[in-house]
Amino acid sequence: MRTRSCLVSLALALSFGAASATAQQRQITGRVTSATTGDAIVGATVAVVGTAIVAATGNEGRFTVAAPEGDVTLVVRRIGFKRKSVPVPAAQSSVEVTLDPDVFNLEAVVVTGQATGVERRTAPNAVATVSANELSRVPAPSVETSIQGKVPGAVIQQNSGAPGGGIQVKLRGVSTLNGLSAPLYVVDGVIMSDAAIPNNQEVVTLSNQGSNPSPLQQNQVNRIADLNPYDIDNVEVLKGASAAAIYGSKAANGVVVITTKRGESGEPRFHVSQRLGFSELAHTLGMHAYKDATDATSFYGAAVANTYCPPPSGACPVFDHERELADRKDLSYESAVDVGGGSENTRYYFSGLAKKDAGIIQNTGYWKQSVRANIDQRLSSRIGVSLGTNFVHTLARRGLTNNDNAFVSYYMSMGFAPSFLDLRPNASGVFPSNPLGTSNPLQTASLMNPSDEDVDRFVGSVKATFDILTGDRHRLQFIGVGGIDRFSQQNALLFPPELQFEQISSLPGVSLLTNADNRNANWSANLVYGYRPASGAFVATTSAGLQYEDRELGISRIVSRNLVAGQQNVNAGTSVSVVQRRERAKDYGFYAQEEVLTLQDRLFLAAGVRGDRSSNNGDVDKYFFYPKAAASYRLPAGAGPFGDVKLRVAWGQSGNQPIYGMKFVSIDATQNITGLPGLVVPPTVGDPSIQPERQTEIEGGVDATLASGRANVEVTLYQKSVSDLLLLRTLAGSGGFQSQFTNGGKLRDRGVEVAVGVVPIQRADVSLLLRSIFFSNSSKIVELPVPAFRVGGFGTNLGQVFVEQGQSATQLFGNVPDNSLQGFHAQRIGDVNPDFLWSFASDLTVQRFNLFALAEWQHGGDLLNLTKLIWDLGGTTADCPTACTQRLAVYGTDTRQFVESATYFKLREVTLSYSLPASAYEWTGAHDARVSLSGRNLLVATGGNYTGMDPEVSNFGNQPVARNIEVAQYPRSRSFWLTVSVGF
């Protein structure tokens, strides 16, 4: 939170309460501006060294500060700029201060504990920070999309092209095999839910009735997508246990700390932004266009060929079903407004957002409305309170895609609709049936009620600070934080009886209604004690605290079949079934941490421990402890090109709690026998002694600035080991259960992160900032106390992710032909994990123009393209009929035909903006105005043998290891935007 960052910054500037001002004082006035643009800097802090006196700059960058008589030194700092010490002689009463931009965020305060932080240039961990400006250049479907390519060590990928999100964030490789894989999200101290609740479309698609019964094949959205990116001030990413240990048993997958914007002292400042744009289909699979009856006969036979490619010419008509389905370019928009300001004691920030992302398929899209109010109040010189509230409403319509054993979703059914079929409606609006399949995808997109996912969400937070003790050498502060995150989600899907696949059903017409209610509540109480001896030899910060979290989720699903025509209500069917699930978990934790900054602020040492217990564990009263230790040392300035060199090392442990239900037997009470209630036990039983997975990580690195601060390099090497993995072990059939959850085994990740930034040009009229991020990780199963097993995919016929001791945790297994009696055997055929990710960013400013571009290159890695199999079966793949027939001939014996390259190069963001001259807007009372053109994913290049829609894909949603499985996904799109933003 910015409040925390400011407190830490002020604490460093004031040296924890040096001597107070003398009785004789004078007034010093001044103005703070940017050294590169000359613009006023609002909200900069101006501290008088050796006193407790601090002032802040107002709207025009001006300040007035009381100072003792005699010579003094002012320290001026602002987030995003380098601090500056300014000597002010006794005879001088005014100063002009210019601050250089801190383009590498070295002076930003980053998280080191629950209630503490340290400047990034001193931090012993590789903590990534993404600023508000970096988040909002190009509209994005979710916050995670906005940080793609900007965080070393992070693989951030969408699961499909559907509007509304569905993004996975993986930090430093594999952290679990069967546990939760998402990072912990903390927003202004509130632990946010990132639950992904399926919409229950599997009732119709039967995706869970094939070789993989997973319910996560329904293109679900993880709920962090609800956040408004415009409200975010910065994002800090703690990537591993060495940095996130203080968050305990929920931090094994990393921690994403999000701080929202706060008001600043001064007159109200308004910002209004209006964006208009559209999305378009970026890539098609390419359907084979059958030329004539002879061509069509080779796959479909003479009867079909002569019907649709009739004599005497025998020519086949050609219809582009892909573009008929997904070629919409409807208007999208984002309207955002915010205002912030306040006095010395009261500050406020209010914002509002209205957003629409139009889908490229009929009846799909995403809408969001958000309002926020953040208020900071100083009740006295010692007591401060910060409040935050956020109301969000979202509506997602994501269509019908992904795996489908009923062959009714868009791209599954399209695979059985060759190019010579006309699927368009007639003049009366009636769609024809697909004679070669079970569904007409154009009819489904038009008539299916658009799978509304309606979410209402409230997030509230409160933070109270009390300066218990403030003296020359000591400072003791109490920090209390509490918050609640609550959302309700409703999914309503209607498959009317008029649909082709419903007409052949014994109970035509299906209405699905899912209601989910989630509540996360947490509070923490923290004490932070700072001490600095009279000698000033060191600064010690001791922190300790307690934390409590209560999570509750309830889901009810209603399925109604055989509907009365035209009715959607679930009571309009003759066959109705109801399923309900409830879960609740409580966590308790405490921590203690010590931090020391010494040797003229060059040596930083930290050590701490976190203790956690949870109702999800087998023993609810047992505490699990997670220690950490870290150190960094900034070398004295040396000769040559190096300006500042920091050596750092950190070690720590964190955990990953068992998923709710892994410790007991979940009894199904929905069964009945002749109307009498009955109980059914599942095939898998819990373990009453289940405990969290334990991650141990060590990282080391070097950070260096070069060329007088015009270049910065960060290099990090890490190794993390995860023990007590959450596994399934097979049980003897005589016991009544097939398997049981258990702890055991060990996996290891090793990786390297490199971040480079260079400012080759920095003048008043021209500046250029270049950034590059490189990341590579490899994982290995070190120990496995159970037989090798599948964690994703559909068996060796179609390929699967296979866990095996001594092998990569992300290897792909499949069938390969041999000379045996069976004719094939299973072996490794690829690996999901890429060789590396490499991103490149350029930020060029020429006078009033700014051009920003971000590209990301993923090299290596494999995926399973099963969409190609579906289209092969239907004879519609681009290389049919010859090549697809050859592939079908070896189906079941050679899975390698589905393995394709996951390499891609994506131009993720491009923005060209122009700052209007004052003469263009000053008559309105505005103080700045900007116009920009931007685009997202404008260019995508893929690996040589890739033939699918997008290598950034996951049929099973967010997964620990089983990504890169493509089955009839929502197609990829590119977006274009025009933005006008004005500040008052």
Label every PLM stretch briefly:
Residues 129, 150, 162-167, 177-179, ...:
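Residues embedded in well-ordered regular secondary structure
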Residues 31-49, 73-82, 91-136, 144:
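Short, acidic, small-residue-rich periplasmic hinge/interaction motif at the N-terminus
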Residues 187, 233, 324-399, 455-460, ...:
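Transmembrane beta-barrel wall of Gram-negative outer-membrane proteins
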Residues 1-26, 82:
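Cleavable N-terminal targeting peptides that direct proteins into the secretory/outer-membrane pathway or into
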Residues 51-62:
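Short, acidic Ser/Thr/Gly-rich low-complexity loop/linker segments typical of extracellular
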Residues 147, 154, 189, 235, ...:
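Non-catalytic regulatory/gating segments with a bias toward low-complexity or hydrophobic composition
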